[in-house]
């Protein structure tokens, strides 16, 4: 059985590999178990058994909502078009009790804030209960930028024990964020939002996207120079390259304009590999993408920024919150893949950071001998072939995804 966005975007293609193509949420696995093993093996209600996950440490995780009420063009949630769905206060409380006593709780939502004010306040109240009862010391969540339009929202979560908030800044260039339908980021200046959050005593975390397809290397370097030269704001938690994920408006825009590089495979869509034609020469862009993985050329300035940021914010943030913000410096100066599981196997060769030329990693080498009929399962799925054309094996799924997206996103051009 398989699920997730790739399966939802390519259901017909994936059916050739999977016994069960799951297009819904994780609870659909109950139906798989009922069909494959019998109804006696499937629970009537979905209650995760955190007690069986002995490896969970001091940080627990819960889910207080699903999906998002915004439609950023590069986001898989936009491609799937599901409405924002918060859970009830009772359900969130039940999850917290199941997780048990932890030091911190991470709320694994796409958007903790959402568009339901009543639900938001109820869920914050539940998190306050957990802190006050000693179930955990603090918590973190992801919110969209509209959360910061009213200071009372920030004060509400801070007083409820919120340690840190992650928000998708993506770029300080509001023209770029607006181009990707992320208009909520243009309502207030981002530096002002970040400063207000920090001064309220809540760590602000964010990520950056460097779009080499629409911005020059010089332009992106100027933005990075601004960040490392501004001690008022923390460093980003990550810096990634935009991905043309099938099913999203951004994907169809790139597909229709012929900008996805020939030979691009699904395994290349990893946020560290260039898969869309760049403004600068591709060789220069690839070298820049490689240097970004360890922030080559910025490490000394990152160290200075960390010292200055700590000095500027130690009166606002506790040692734990300050440490959370400063941890980003270590994340940026280490290759992105070092944060992934270590047992996935190493790539068989030097990385190129260009789609279609990246060496394959251990996922494509079976650990033991398998029958030849499974050979295709260990080959990367081609998105765009060597001629620059869409892979015919997935063409029907891609067309169906466009048809489903058009009613929701009229800006997506028809085939």
Regions found by a protein language model. Give the residues of each.
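Catalytic cores of alpha/beta
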Residues: 10-16, 152-153, 214-229
